[in-house]
Amino acid sequence: MAKGAREKIKLESTAGTGHFYTTTKNKKTTPDKMLIMKFDPKARKHVEYKEIKLK
């Protein structure tokens, strides 16, 4: 079976609350690290989430 191009990643809040989302991304089309605005329920506002490697 062929291995897919998508890799699991973890998006961690930059607000320092420890909240994170998990998702996948295509390494070929998006080689850079993701930086995306998402809602942090602990901070109760939209903050930037940075990509870190899923362990």
From Swiss-Prot:
Which keywords annotate this record? Ribonucleoprotein, Ribosomal protein
Which Pfam family is one of this chain's hits? Ribosomal_L33
Single GO MF annotation: structural constituent of ribosome
- Give GO BP annotations, semicolon-separated: translation
**Any signal peptide, and if so, which residues?**
none
Supply one GO CC term from the record: cytosolic large ribosomal subunit
Instruction: Name the InterPro entries on file.
Output: Ribosomal_bL33 (IPR001705), Ribosomal_bL33_sf (IPR038584), Ribosomal_zn-bd (IPR011332)
Which family does the record claim for this protein?
Belongs to the bacterial ribosomal protein bL33 family.
Q: Which HAMAP family match?
A: Ribosomal_bL33
The entry's protein name is Large ribosomal subunit protein bL33
Encoding gene, per UniProt annotation: rpmG
